[in-house]
Amino acid sequence: MNGWIVKTLGLLLITSLLLTGPGVAKASETSTFSDISGHKYEALIEQAAEDGWVNGCPDGRFWPDRPITRLEYAKMMLAALNIVPGSQRAKEVLQSTEVPKEVLSLADDGWASKEGWVELGFASGLVVLGDYGSYLVLPHDEGISRYESTIFAVRMLGRFEESLTMVVEEPPFDDLVPDMQVDNFGVIEIAVENGLISGYTETKFYPAESFTRGEAVATVSRVLTLLGRN
């Protein structure tokens, strides 16, 4: 009887090991987030999460097709550059650039301000208040447009000043017109030439369309590659 019990326990132990072994664990770890399997940017999102510059929502999803806000995008870029509140790199950025008090006074008491991302966004030069015309506050909770996201990306690449001096005789897409919506064709030219972003079609850019979290990860990943950090 005792021998039978021992054999039974042994079989149960072996079965348990098989069920919880590497094969099963691997299946449960195929994706960091529950909603990106098969997504166009799945591999890039996985890599970004592994590198520590993106995270998902409390429900375990990443929401790759959800529009990203201005400060969410700025935070993603700063984290990708290792400019994280409290880090040595962040301290160096804050010491090298004095953020005007009037700018800090515009920040609300939301998560980005409390955690220090707003100050870093301005200090790093990724966020420039003048981009928002007569706004007295940074409209950070609004979804960022494709055109504005391109400005952020070219700033992260370090080529924004260059874009201001470029002479673009013919816009790269036929839905780009010189108005309040698009006032710098140079950033789009630089972004497209370097593969940071592309048009929806060969002739349409849709500058006012929202920019998604998945697209944001893809763009930041491409900038990092150009900077030699990937």
Which role fits each region the language model picked out?
Residues G52, G195:
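Phosphate/pyrophosphate-binding loop motifs in nucleotide- or prenyl diphosphate-using proteins
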Residues I45-A48, M77, G121, E189-A191:
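A short amphipathic alpha-helical interaction element
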Residues W4, L18-K40, N55-A74, L78-W117, ...:
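Feature responds to low-complexity, polar/acidic, surface-exposed segments characteristic
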Residues G10-T20:
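Bacterial N-terminal signal peptides
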Residues M1-L9:
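Bacterial N-terminal signal peptides that target proteins for export
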